């Protein structure tokens, strides 16, 4: 059994790594804590999440940039450059796959078995949904179908736990609804489902705004605004009858949604 001193040291190293923007080392430090098979504190949980978010985020950004350049080169007929870009994309995709698989192992083998609180259960299942979604962003064919299905199951498990354990205004429940709706819009190509989920979460939170915890007011209202922004973007993709059902949500140009991470 690892000592509390070791745990404290890993957490401190993770905080240092975050300040120094050395996110790979931040992840390693927090993985060491997770591997102790202890229930993480809110602070530890957030450190782990921030580390992985940055490690995967830089690769997702790289992938998007390279994909955009690839499209431009294809339109110009520069086959040699397209070939070079495809090879580079494969490298980034391999890194993304490894990072996402890595966090899945940590969640499934250490974090979920060690957690008792409903909030943590929602948090970890949401994380699984997010990282399978990141895989679905670049996978194709059956591989995409498989990770999309796993993402859906994780988001559904998180939603079931959230509805049982967390208030509609809780930032983790709202963040889950935000990311789950992005999954429907971007991965499942279902703007109707995305809008329904986002609007339902927004409306339920609005109805309980008076009971909003002062500590989480800023986080909750920020996510509610993101839900609203996405609804504004997405309603222009709906058929007219479905759009009417959104009860006056403003329309704007269609585009990808913002997610909580």
Curated annotation (Swiss-Prot):
Protein name: 14-3-3 protein 9
GO CC annotation terms, alphabetical: cytoplasm
Record's subunit section: Homodimer.
Organism: Solanum lycopersicum
Chain residue ranges for the region called Disordered: 239-261
Similarity comment text for this entry: Belongs to the 14-3-3 family.
Lineage, highest ranks first: Eukaryota, Viridiplantae, Streptophyta, Embryophyta, Tracheophyta
Pfam families, per database record: 14-3-3
Disulfide bonds listed in the record: none
Gene Ontology terms describing biological process: protein localization; signal transduction
């Amino acid at each position: 059994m690892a000592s509390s001193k070791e745990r404290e040291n890993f957490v401190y190293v993770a905080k240092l790594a975050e300040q120094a923007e050395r996110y790979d080392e931040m992840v390693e430090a927090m993985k060491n804590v997770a591997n102790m098979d202890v229930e993480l504190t809110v602070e530890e949980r957030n450190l782990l999440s921030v580390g992985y978010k940055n490690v995967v985020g830089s690769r997702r950004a790289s992938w998007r940039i390279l994909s955009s350049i690839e499209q431009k080169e294809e339109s110009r007929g520069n086959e040699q450059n397209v070939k070079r870009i495809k090879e580079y994309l494969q490298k980034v995709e391999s890194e993304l796959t490894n990072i996402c698989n890595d966090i899945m192992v940590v969640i499934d083998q250490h974090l979920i078995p060690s957690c008792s609180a409903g909030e943590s259960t929602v948090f970890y299942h949401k994380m699984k949904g997010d990282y399978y979604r990141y895989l679905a962003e670049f996978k194709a064919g059956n591989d995409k179908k498989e990770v999309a299905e796993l993402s859906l199951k994780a988001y559904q498990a998180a939603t079931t736990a959230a509805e049982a354990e967390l208030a509609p205004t809780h930032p983790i429940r709202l963040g889950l609804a935000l990311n789950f709706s992005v999954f429907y819009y971007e991965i499942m190509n279902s703007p109707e489902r995305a809008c329904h989920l986002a609007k339902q979460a927004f409306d339920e939170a609005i109805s309980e705004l008076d009971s909003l915890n002062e500590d989480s007011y800023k986080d909750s209202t920020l996510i509610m605004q993101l839900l609203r922004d996405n609804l504004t973007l997405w309603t222009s993709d709906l058929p007219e009858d479905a759009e009417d059902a959104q009860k006056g949500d403003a329309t704007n140009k269609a585009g990808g949604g913002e997610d909580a991470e």
